[in-house]
Amino acid sequence: MLSENTINIVKSTAPLLAETGPKLTAHFYQRMFEHNPELKDIFNMSNQRNGDQREALFNAICAYASNIDNLPALLGAVEKIAHKHSSFLITADQYQIVGGHLLATIDELFSPGQAVLDAWAEAYGVLANVFIQREEQIYQDNQSQTGGWRGLREFELVEKQYESAHICSFVFKPVDGGSVVSFKPGQYLGIYINDEQFENQEIRQYSLSSSVRPDCYRISVKREEGGRVSNYLHDHLDVGSKVKLAAPAGDFFLDAAPTAPVVLISAGVGLTPTLSMLESLTEHQAPVTWIHATENGQQHAFKQHVKQLVETHPHFNSLVWYNQPNSDDKIGDDFQFSGWVNLHEIETVLKQADVQVYFCGPVGFMQFIAKQLLEMGVPEQQFHYECFGPHKVV
C-alpha cells in the first residue's frame, strides 16, 4: 500500500512528465539499451525506430502518475500489458533493471531531489509487484493446462498457404508430438526468431486465426513493407522449418453470452482474431454478423472460407466493403459496399439488444469504427478492440 506522501509526490510530477513528452522515454530506452544491450533481444527494435514503443511507455507512465490514487482505473491496462509481457517471457529480475533505468532517467532529466526519487521508487515497486504476480499467474495457468508449457516450446511448420496477395497462413505442430494448450478466440501466439540475418533475436505476436485445434496452431501474417519478421516468415520459413513459440496470451478474446448478438468488424489483416472468433461461434444461439473491409478482391483473404461458413450456418451473415474494387470484383457476390465502412448503412445490426462488438484493424480504421458506434449509442462496455503492436486508445 502506498503512503499518502508517496501518492502526493508522484501525482505532483504528472504535469512535468506530460510536458516533457516522449523525450522522457527516448532517454530511458537509450540509457537502458546502452547499459543492458541484452534487452534488445526482448524489445521490438522496429517499434523503437518508429517511436511507437516510446509513445506507449510514455502514455503508461503518465497514466500511472495521474491515477496513482485510483489504481482500479488502471486494471484494464495492467491486464493487457501483463499478457503481452507473458508472451515476451518477462522475468522479475528484468523489472529491477527497468526500474533502475526509469529512476536514473528521472534523476538525469529533472534532478528532482531524493524525496521524489524515493517516492517513484516506492510507486514503481508496487506496480512491478502487481505485474510480477499477474504474469506468474498467467505462466502457471498455461503450464497447468493440458498441452500447456512454460517458456519456449519447439514447433515445426507443417503447412504454409497464401490466403490473399499479401497474407499467408502458417500452421505449426509441436516437435515433441504432444497436444497444445487451448486458447480463447482472439488471443495471439508469441513467435521467436533467431537467424544470422538479424542482429538480435526478434519476437513478435500474431493472432491465432482459427478456432481451437487439439494438436496445432495457425497464424496468418501480412507481408508488411519493411517488416523484418513478416518478410522473413513469407520468404524464408518453409514447411519443415522449426521455430520456438510462447504459449497463447492476450486480453482481447470472445466473451459473449450465448444469447447475445455478436458483430465482428475487421479491416485488412485485422480479420485474423475475428476469424478465430467466427469459427468458434458456429453453435452460437444469436445472430453473428461478419463485417470486413479490404482494398479489393486481390486483397480479400479467406473470402471463400467465410462464404462457406455463412452458407452452412443460418445465424451467420457477412457484409464486405471494398475500398477500390477491381473491374472483375462483383458487387453482391464478392462485396456488398464500396468505399469506407459506413456502419450507419447497417444500423439495425448494431442496435440489437445486448450486442457485443469486436473489431480490429489499422488504428485510423478502429477510431473511425469506435466513433460510429458511439454515435449510434452502442455502450462502450459492449465493444472491444485489439491493436497490433503497442497499444493505442481508440
UniProtKB/Swiss-Prot annotation:
Catalytic activity from the UniProt record: 2 nitric oxide + NADPH + 2 O2 = 2 nitrate + NADP(+) + H(+); 2 nitric oxide + NADH + 2 O2 = 2 nitrate + NAD(+) + H(+)
GO BP term (any one): cellular response to nitrosative stress
Site location (Involved in heme-bound ligand stabilization and O-O bond activation): 29
Domain FAD-binding FR-type: 150-255
Cofactors that this protein relies on: heme b; FAD
Cofactor: record remark: Binds 1 heme b (iron(II)-protoporphyrin IX) group per subunit.
Catalytic site: 95, 135
Binding residues for FAD: 188, 204-207, 387-390
InterPro entries: Cbr1-like_FAD-bd_dom (IPR008333), FAD-bd_FR_type (IPR017927), Flavoprot_Pyr_Nucl_cyt_Rdtase (IPR001709), FNR_nucleotide-bd (IPR039261), Globin (IPR000971), Globin-like_sf (IPR009050), Globin/Proto (IPR012292), Hmp (IPR023950)
Record-marked site positions (Influences the redox potential of the prosthetic heme and FAD groups): 84, 386
GO molecular function terms noted in the UniProt entry: FAD binding; heme binding; metal ion binding; nitric oxide dioxygenase NAD(P)H activity; oxygen binding; oxygen carrier activity
Region of interest (Reductase), residue spans: 147-394
Entry EC no(s): 1.14.12.17
Note on domains (UniProt): Consists of two distinct domains; an N-terminal heme-containing oxygen-binding domain and a C-terminal reductase domain with binding sites for FAD and NAD(P)H.
Family under the similarity heading: Belongs to the globin family. Two-domain flavohemoproteins subfamily.
Name of protein: Flavohemoprotein
Gene that this sequence comes from: hmp
